[in-house]
């Protein structure tokens, strides 16, 4: 199979997991209960753990390898600042789409990076795709629940999944010979994800007199550790 078709399929699947997460949220008709509340908090922290693993094992290591100290610091801090400004802007708008916007804000640069690194290192490309898929599932689940006033929630998530192949193919053709730009984008995304985790996800892990939900973060990070282990 031509490499570009592999990129299209892999990046599309990575985006489709957000839709799968939304479908799970849609078919959930159970009554609110302590168990359900723990599960929902656990899904949130699972996504946080996977995001941290993506930063630790896929995004920042590429920046450390390809960038000197100053560009590395600038891109990482810029990513955090950009997500901070986006978060502030959404709060001013009182937007019910913060989780969905955050999903797109980290998915698109990651997909561009996926396409860019695939030509030089398909193994890293598949590894990055696995991280994107794992993080998009709980993000899609949470985004669907957040968009409770929107009548076309699944359509939005399906449309978001199609942005993956577009971004990945763009990265493949435009950035495959620009490893430093690709590494900068990955580090930028890493900084943004770190902001997202500690601003939005970690505070939601706290549930009074319940101690299991934060273990979702450990499980999510373990998924990343196992991916790194088997990749090597």
Could you say what each language-model-derived stretch is?
Residues 1-232:
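Intrinsically disordered, metal-sensing/regulatory segments
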């Amino acid at each position: 199979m031509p490499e570009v078709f592999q990129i299209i399929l892999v990046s599309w699947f990575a985006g489709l997991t957000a839709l799968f997460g939304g479908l799970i949220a849609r078919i959930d008709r159970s009554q609110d209960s302590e168990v359900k509340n723990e599960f929902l908090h656990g899904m949130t922290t699972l996504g946080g753990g996977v995001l941290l693993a993506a930063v630790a094992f896929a995004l920042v290591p590429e920046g450390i390898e390809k960038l000197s100290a100053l560009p590395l610091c600038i891109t990482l801090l810029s990513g955090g600042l950009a997500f901070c400004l986006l978060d502030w802007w959404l709060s001013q708008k009182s937007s019910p789409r913060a989780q969905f916007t955050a999903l797109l804000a980290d998915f698109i640069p990651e997909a561009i990076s996926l396409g860019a690194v695939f030509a030089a290192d398909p193994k890293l490309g598949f590894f990055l795709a696995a991280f994107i898929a794992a993080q998009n599932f709980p993000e899609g689940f949470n985004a669907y629940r957040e968009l409770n006033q929107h009548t076309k929630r699944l359509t939005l998530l399906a449309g978001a999944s199609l942005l993956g192949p577009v971004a990945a193919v763009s990265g493949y053709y435009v950035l495959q010979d620009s490893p430093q730009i690709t590494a900068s984008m990955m580090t930028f995304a890493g900084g943004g994800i770190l902001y997202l985790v500690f601003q939005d996800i970690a505070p939601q892990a706290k549930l009074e007199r319940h101690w299991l939900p934060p273990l979702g973060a450990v499980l999510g990070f373990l998924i990343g550790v196992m991916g790194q282990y088997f990749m090597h």
